[in-house]
Amino acid sequence: MKKLVLLAIVAVVLGYTAKAQDAEEFRENWQKTITVSASQTTTIEKLFTAWGKQFPGQYVDAFNKFKKTGKANKIEVYENFFRDFKVDLAPRNGYIEISTADTMIAQVDANFRKGDTIVRKHILNAAYWNLPSGNKLFGISIEDDGEIFAECALAFYEYDVNKGALSPSPQMVKKVMAIVNDDPETFIILPKEGRDLKYLDFNPHGNITYKTIKWKGKGF
């Protein structure tokens, strides 16, 4: 019986670890040029679909299912461990949000009673901004809420409407991350409304406030 309980705990921990590694792995490997069909007409779906071909995974799978059926999906990753996807597509705003809530019914845990519901949230934002050159700045931000701590990743690409390519913009990422002291646990919230970025700031007194990173016309 103890062996079965141990295996169940290991499976859950591995599940959270794998999820956290999604953001961590992307943070290490995002700087790739991505081919997109050249066009003066840009949509968030077009940019995200091209990005998703380079970086497939559960977020992309959920979005593709949403496009086909009008809803995302709920899957049982392990026994009593569910992952529920939701998609917010706002074409006029140039914005996509894909979120999951991992729900686990606790069996054995020092911090939970048997039968308690444990929820871990994960989220992906995608958005784009118009640049003075006519090109677009495309952003991806990911937060994976792990068992112990969150793993976050941020990426920016410049979309050349004439060449049809998403080229990584590491300097833009560097500028934004410098504001949050390069903290890999800070989730940068891309805008559904407006152009500015936001993030949660935790001060030493335990107060939580939203801070803004202003859009400056060509970047942040």
Please report, for each region that a protein language model flagged, where it lies by residue.
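Structural signature of eukaryotic scaffold interfaces centered on beta-propeller domains
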Residues: 124-133, 185-193
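Mid-length scaffold segments of soluble, non-membrane domains
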Residues: 132-169
